[in-house]
Amino acid sequence: MAGEQHAQPTSVPAEAREKHAQLAEQIEEHRFRYYVKDAPVVSDAEFDTLLRSLEALEEEYPELRTPDSPTQKVAGGYETEFTAVQHRERMLSLDNAFDDLGLAAWAERVAKDVGTSDYHFLCELKVDGLAVNLTYEHGRLTRAATRGDGRTGEDITPNVRTIAEIPDRLKGDRIPDLVEIRGEVYFPMEKFEELNARLVEAGDKPFANPRNAAAGSLRQKDPRVTATRPLHMVVHGIGARQGFDIDRLSQAYELLREWGLPTTRYARVVDDLDGVREFIAYYGENRHSVEHEIDGVVVKLDEIPLQGRLGSTSRAPRWAIAWKYAPEEVNTKLINIRVGVGRTGRVTPYAQVEPVTVAGSEVEFATLHNQDVVKAKGVLIGDTVVLRKAGDVIPEILGPVVDLRDGTERAFVMPAECPECGTPLAPAKEGDVDLRCPNARTCPAQLRERLFYLAGRKSLDIEQFGYVAAAALTKPLEPAEPPLLDEGDLFDLTIERLLPIKAYVLDQDSGLPKRDPKTGEEKVATVFANQQGEPRKNAISMLDNIAAAKERPLARILTGLSIRHVGPVAAEALARAFRSIDRIDQATEEELKDTDGVGPIVAAAVKQWFAEDWHREIIRKWKAAGVRMEDERSGEDEGPRPLEGLTVVVTGTLEHHTRDGAKEALQSRGAKVTGSVSKKTSFVVVGDNPGSKYDKAMQLKVPVLNEAGFAVLLEQGPEAAAEVALPTEE
């Protein structure tokens, strides 16, 4: 056939090729152990001998000297590219049961559809971590990938190989030709606080919870960073397999253990639903005896042939279900009720409680929303209170334990003045429940919160500019004059201005100084200089990142200005319609209101913001510093908008896009992104844990795209995307 490529004859003997492959594999393995794991198993001399043998072989047979040969690579240059890879067998989600009725209904469906009474349930703890898929071929780990959208994940093989529990080679008997091993990578609870303390000390943002810590650690571009994190894994399933057959999942777990894989210690085979209930109840009471966070209990049909008989829906197996525990509640002492000041001046009461462990993390503070909520809950300072926390949700005070009062409790009185700047508090308008500090410009608390928000990922995305840096720049102990009186001078910061700054190390939740655990004294730090007075690396990086932020798109600039009611979605709508900060300023309130995605509340807030002279001064200073204040394309010269007229809903967690990034990609191509599914919806894009929007789309037969289909929509348009949409259930 024309254009067909024919294999070229080769003069390299087969035994030379085999020897070359063996040497290359050995050298790569030893390099990985030396540069990434920092745990070499051969001496430098032995390694050099291997490398010289490979070089000699390539000298004799030049055809073997390919670009990917170890002789052609720079040692130590390991970096994960996170390329997309296809799972051989799809990684499904799980349906959930939140109460005994839901669990019993699932068990009843299993009993009805399985066609026999001879079956068992396998119960195991649901690890709250990052799902991964390991591929072993002839016993050797050839690939590790994240779950992604279930069909396509990211290749994280070098990073996973740094986890000591995951074997590079399987050991023992009955090793299959191919097997996919599914599991969860997690961050141990006891190490989580240590990591966050180090991150804060370095000026980086701490992780919200151990699951995020596991995901962030595993997705480092440099595997050497991953190697420093105490990651662990629990294996909980099998995907595609060749040369491997087994009758029961519990037996498979035993075999996986023999192969050297880390299976769960918290699993039990039971005969019936009562056994399932006993397992759930036991770990409901003993969940904190487990070294990792748990997200519930997974109940599976143990017999693998019967699993195949029940099959799966388009998103979850019918033979398994996840039991979700109710949010955990504990009693603790309400030490005080303080007030915090937010970036828009809103003054919010919050509870300071005796430290207590709940839902896997230690809690010292909880939200109380406003003074009316404090009254409605009936809590007094000194009360024993009931506190609830679920996952990474903000802890909440439910109410007092009235029977434990001893008469020393006292009522909370909302302060009349701002606790940070002393300005009298007042409602923003008549009838408002919330009180606000009207001193927006010079209140250090408001500026601190605005700067922290401005540096966040949804705004200017300035890495190394964390809460400690924002506090130090707005209310230092030294010098007396804060380096930043408002946002206007942000882009004029220099290392010389940063070095002398001393400040309290503030807690992000409370805004209070942290205390040394040994001495009890409030922590003070020279934030940007080391003990020798030289710049810290994070200070230099912060200034570099501030400079890079000058080139952010207009929508992110608008978000960073903290205009009330203007979040990322409204900012994108304004930027898309007006293309420059000046045109937004010059637009009438009517023009703003009529803009798609804006409306009267946002329009009024924008006009009110630009009416302040000091806000205009920020814009002037940023322009002078070179901050980009308009998008490059004009409305007349706008590029093609292939998704014009489409309405798209995005739900669940995407692997290759943040939620905001997905919206930006759709909106820049002309699509309208909404938050609810209807018959008018063109496509629903689903990631991990999509929830009810996915179900609604299936019910209405709206085309549903996984992340691979989403890529087709962006790159090839709606017609091509429709062809790869997920099948709707009949």
Swiss-Prot record:
Positions contributing to NAD(+) binding: 44-48, 93-94, 124, 147, 184, 300, 324
Entry binding sites for Zn(2+): 418, 421, 437, 443
PROSITE patterns in the record: BRCT (PS50172), DNA_LIGASE_N1 (PS01055), DNA_LIGASE_N2 (PS01056)
Keyword annotations: DNA damage, DNA repair, DNA replication, Ligase, Magnesium, Manganese, Metal-binding, NAD, Zinc
Catalytic activity: NAD(+) + (deoxyribonucleotide)n-3'-hydroxyl + 5'-phospho-(deoxyribonucleotide)m = (deoxyribonucleotide)n+m + AMP + beta-nicotinamide D-nucleotide
Residues making up the signal peptide according to the UniProt record: none
Entry-linked CDD domains: BRCT_DNA_ligase_like, LIGANc
Residues annotated as catalytic: 126
Domain BRCT: 638-727
Pfam short name (any one): DNA_ligase_OB
InterPro entries cross-referenced by the UniProt entry: BRCT_dom, BRCT_dom_sf, DisA/LigA_HHH, DNA_ligase, DNA_ligase_AS, DNA_ligase_CS, DNAligase_adenylation, DNAligase_N
Family according to the record: Belongs to the NAD-dependent DNA ligase family. LigA subfamily.
Protein's UniProt name: DNA ligase
Origin species: Streptomyces avermitilis (strain ATCC 31267 / DSM 46492 / JCM 5070 / NBRC 14893 / NCIMB 12804 / NRRL 8165 / MA-4680)
Source taxonomy: Bacteria, Bacillati, Actinomycetota, Actinomycetes, Kitasatosporales
GN (gene name): ligA
